[in-house]
Regions:
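Primarily recognizes the serine-hydrolase "nucleophile elbow" in alpha/beta-hydrolase
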Residues: 112-115, 120-166
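Short beta-strand element of the alpha/beta-hydrolase
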Residues: 53-65
Length: 470
């Protein structure tokens, strides 16, 4: 049975407007009200062993689609293990300005401070992808936030970082992620700015890290607090943490990934300075770097980095040219490029497979950025948008929204041949939402053509011939 806390804000914060707040321990409490007049809410996770007798570290978790509970659920196991409170707003959104999102976050944070005892200098921010980019700029605006856990994304804006107010930055990234290269380069930038930082790198099919990696990031925040004398040092905790990270490094070696082992050993020197003597780590790292297995693996990875850089330059150049000239014939070249990446996915060479994954992520992000840029223009270039949507069907064939946009845009200019082609491609790829098809904007005339309904009947077994009222 879940344990339940029941207390009033006034008993903790002295607010004049008391409200009863019921927070679950070991589970996510949704729809906690920030401000009745603004209609803002957030979700909270408290560890099962939470009590009001001592202050706790808090991690503000951001998902810019406003899915607070979903964001918390991915970090709740790590928070349970490492003793962190989690809070996530339901109202932050990428459609809002940075200043609006900061104000929403600040109101949530202030509400958290009034509800539960928060440890001094132990308030942090975290996020996944877009949410991570926002989290990385939050310490600039909310001074109580002392660190960031950024999962799969670099710092949102390097220019606003203030060397006089550094915060802890912990990046977590898969080597398959196209952001990996940028996050790796970010370490040097943060070092120059004297921002303490680590980068936890992992491999695997899933771009989202496992729970142990997420828990490691939270543990590093605690160790950093001990190193700065903001948290009372616990020698047993420090030694257990050291042994845990060293065991992880050894597992990388035994699994044939010496580069990952070197990444972690390098970070251990940062994490445990000045908490303990680092001579053993320095010797281990030096020995690893001299080994033939590491030299060969590092050389191979760097060679693929170079090849990747050249390919990215080609992608950027040809995409710009194709957009400017509406170069539809070159869609065949892009299809060939994706087929080549598909072949590399089956390579026996790890670094080649990882390069293919990063390149696919890069071109997808590049196309998305161009779509956003063109769509935001006062005079939207519909033909350029249509080209990009067509390209998206090649690089992300299961993203059905792009097919629907092409069908709608093509029908608007009565290019029914193009609309029909992408209708069939859409259905070939497994799309089944007939209701949405018959309600697509600007397709009223197209939907009543025999050709449209024949294709629908071919793949969905039944067509609707009458005109549907809009």
């Amino acid at each position: 049975m879940k344990k339940i806390l029941f207390f009033t804000v006034v008993l903790i914060s002295g607010f004049s407007n008391a409200q009863d707040v019921r927070l679950l321990k070991g589970a996510i409490t949704e729809n906690v009200v920030v401000n009745d007049s603004l209609g803002e809410t957030f979700s909270v996770y408290l560890p099962t062993y939470f009590d009001l007798s001592r202050p706790w570290p808090v991690l503000l978790v951001f998902d810019l689609e406003g899915k607070g509970k979903s964001a918390l659920s991915m970090l709740s196991n790590a928070a349970e293990k490492e003793g962190f409170i989690l809070a996530s707003s339901d109202n932050t959104n990428d459609s809002l300005s940075i200043s609006q999102n900061v104000l929403i976050s600040n109101r949530m944070f202030n509400n958290m401070v009034s509800l539960v005892p928060i440890a001094k200098n132990q308030s942090y921010a975290a996020g996944f992808e877009g949410g991570a980019k926002f989290a990385s700029i939050l310490p600039t605006f909310i001074k109580e936030v002392k660190g960031v856990v950024s999962i799969g994304a670099p710092v949102g804006n390097i220019e606003i970082l203030n060397p006089k107010s550094p915060f802890k930055f912990i990046g977590i990234v898969n080597r398959n992620d196209f952001n990996f290269r940028e996050m790796e380069a970010l370490r040097d930038v943060l070092d120059r700015l004297k921002f303490p930082n680590q980068l936890l790198v992992f491999d695997g099919e899933q771009l989202v890290p496992d729970q142990n990696t997420l828990a490691s990031a939270l543990r590093i925040l605690t160790l950093n607090g001990m190193a700065k004398n903001e948290i009372v040092a616990d020698p047993q905790f420090i030694q257990e943490s050291f042994d845990m990270f060293l065991a992880k490094s050894n597992s990388f070696l035994s699994n044939g990934t010496p580069v990952l082992a070197e990444y972690l050993l390098s970070d251990m020197k940062r994490i445990f300075n000045p908490l303990m003597d680092l001579d053993s780590i320095k010797k281990t790292e030096k020995s690893l770097r001299r080994s033939s297995s590491y030299k060969q693996a590092n050389r191979s990875q760097n060679n693929y980095f170079l090849k990747e850089d050249f390919t990215k330059e080609d992608y950027a150049y040809y995409l710009e040219e194709d957009i400017l000239t509406y170069n539809y014939p070159n869609l065949g070249w892009w299809k060939y490029q994706m087929e080549e990446l598909d072949k590399l996915d089956k390579s026996k060479v790890l670094y080649e497979r990882q390069m293919a994954s990063r390149l696919r992520g890069y071109i997808n992000a590049l196309v998305e950025d161009n779509i956003d840029f063109i769509a935001a223009d006062k005079t939207v270039d519909v033909e350029a948008l249509n080209f990009l949507y067509m390209l998206k069907t090649i690089i992300a064939p299961k993203d059905f929204d792009n097919y629907l946009k092409i069908i709608s845009n093509s029908s608007r200019i009565e290019d029914y041949g193009t609309a029909l082609f992408y209708l069939e491609e859409l259905l070939k790829n497994g799309y089944t939402n007939k209701k949405q098809l018959y309600e697509l904007p600007d397709t009223a005339l197209f939907r009543i053509t025999p050709e449209f309904n024949m294709v629908v009947e071919k793949y969905l077994k039944e067509a609707r011939y009458e005109v549907i009222e809009q």
